[in-house]
A protein has these predicted regions:
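Oxidoreductase and adenylate-handling cofactor-binding alpha/beta cores
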Residues: 215-235, 248-261, 301-308
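Glycine-rich beta-alpha junction loops
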Residues: 82, 169-170, 242-248, 284-286, ...
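C-terminal active-site "lid" helix and adjoining low-complexity regulatory extension at the edge
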Residues: 387, 392-426
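A short glycine-threonine-serine/GTX helix/turn-capping micro-motif
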Residues: 202-213, 235-237, 267-271, 275-277, ...
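Aromatic-enriched alpha-helical interface/lid elements that frame and gate functional surfaces
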Residues: 275-351, 355
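Short, surface-exposed loop/helix-turn segments at secondary-structure junctions
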Residues: 88-92, 256-266, 367-382
Length: 439
């Protein structure tokens, strides 16, 4: 009987030898966000030893598995021979002189690309599943079942496996068989309805936030399932879907309707329940300011040199400011237009209220604080030469959460994985390649 992999083996071993759990010291430098190649002996990655069978494409699934990979899991990205992940061709922009899309590069670091025809290579997937801890997929419900790769099929050969399905609408219900994209779920889930100018049409958010949110939900769910597996010694099926993710992300907007019977509307950059809280036009751009408390508002108007507003009953508290929104905002907008973003930033330096210029993407990466965080990492890539990636936003005092390797080329690790993990012979691998079952 195959031994279950246990993410807490090392922890339990320590506990068995000592009542007090002591973290071993090693000479691994504190990389935090910096790219580094850790040694086997000193790898402090929380998910070291966890292997993920990644059958996802596009954004939500790859984002989920990328987060797991940053934390040290070994990610085996299963791709379609010949084309691979559709996002590889989502451009322009492409890296100069290549057909590698910058889109694909953004969510596929720390992974190994293995090309397998799922229909003809089903047995290879079974073999891999037995060596893995987690399987993540984002096919339309029923697709993998038809190939013999659904949860029940995989559970028969790998009962220890955490099987996570990411779908548009779940595996049951009126919409279950529909394909799902971020913007469609954001439309059905109300996000587009509440996004945009007050008098304008519904507006798509600038990045695929529903996809990213589902990827984060899935990553957290997988971590919890791994923790539970260490207690119950078996796997389970996790289901995440875009529509549920989007509706759960409505937070106060949903509560306003469910408990206050209040339909939401578009507010531009304003906040429905807090005033002032918006992006104010300045002499050369926009400056976003949020005064969420009365004390913050009082400091704001002092720094704006508007002492006449301090004792004005129309603005004495947030309830009054919301009621008299238009009058107050017109005053503030007129003042903000008099200076540049740089001038306002100097005036607001050290303030108790939050503020920030509306940056272009160039300005984001030129920002001195962003540079200080070392979020941007540059890695070698066999085709593009260099690739710059935004690294993990979370750091640990002990654990490593890092960029280890650049996004893989299509099928870059197929032979390596089949030989080293599955112990397939060179002859067997060559036959699979000749039959175009793998690439």
């Amino acid at each position: 009987m195959m031994m279950m992999r246990n993410i807490f083996t090392a922890f339990l071993r320590k506990r068995a030898t000592s009542e007090k759990f002591v973290i071993s010291e090693c000479n691994l430098k504190k990389c935090q966000r910096e790219f580094c190649q850790t040694t086997t002996e000193c790898d402090r990655s929380p998910l070291k030893g966890i292997r993920v069978l990644d059958l996802t494409r596009i954004v939500a699934g790859p984002y989920c598995t990328m987060v797991l990979g940053d934390l040290g899991a070994e990610i085996l990205k299963i791709e379609r021979p010949g084309g691979g992940d559709e996002a590889r061709k989502w451009g322009p922009p492409f890296f100069e002189g290549t057909q590698e899309s910058t889109y694909f590069m953004s969510v596929n670091r720390n992974k190994k690309s293995v090309c397998i025809d799922l229909k003809r290579g089903k047995d290879i997937i079974y073999d891999l599943a037995q060596t893995c801890d987690v399987l993540v997929e984002n096919y339309v419900p029923g697709k993998l079942n038809s190939l013999g790769l659904g949860y029940e099929d995989i559970a028969k050969v790998a009962p220890h496996l955490i099987y996570c399905s990411l779908t548009g609408y779940g595996s049951q219900g009126p919409y279950a068989n529909r394909p799902g994209y971020d913007v469609i779920a954001a439309s059905l889930g109300g996000l587009l309805h509440i996004t945009g100018l007050k008098d304008g049409p519904p507006c798509k958010v600038g990045v695929a936030m529903t996809d990213l949110a589902m990827g984060l939900y899935a990553h957290g769910a997988i971590m919890a399932a791994l923790l539970q597996r260490s207690k119950i010694n078996k796997g389970q099926w996790i289901q995440c879907d875009l529509l549920s993710t989007q509706i759960a992300s409505l937070i106060n907007i949903a509560s306003n309707y469910l408990n206050g019977n209040k339909e939401a509307t578009r507010w531009g950059s304003e906040h429905e329940s807090i005033v002032p809280y918006e992006a104010f036009p300045t002499k050369d751009g926009y400056m976003t300011v949020g005064a969420g408390s009365d004390l913050q508002f009082q400091e704001l108007i002092k720094r704006l040199q508007l002492p006449e507003l301090i004792n004005n009953d129309k603005f004495k508290n947030n309830i009054a400011r919301v009621k008299n929104r238009m009058e107050l905002l017109q005053i503030l907008r007129d003042v903000f237009k008099r200076k540049t973003n740089k001038e306002w930033s100097a005036i607001f330096e050290g303030a108790s209220f939050p503020y920030g210029a509306v940056n272009t993407i160039k300005e984001v990466f030129d920002d001195p604080h962003v540079k200080y965080t070392k979020l941007v990492q540059e890695l070698e890539h066999p085709v593009t030469g260099k690739v710059k990636l935004v690294g993990p936003p979370v750091t640990y005092s002990y654990a490593t959460n890092i960029v280890r390797s650049s996004p893989p080329m299509l099928g870059q690790h197929t032979s390596e994985v089949l030989k080293n993990i599955l112990k397939y012979s060179d002859e067997k691998i060559e036959n699979l390649i000749a039959q175009k079952i793998v690439q």
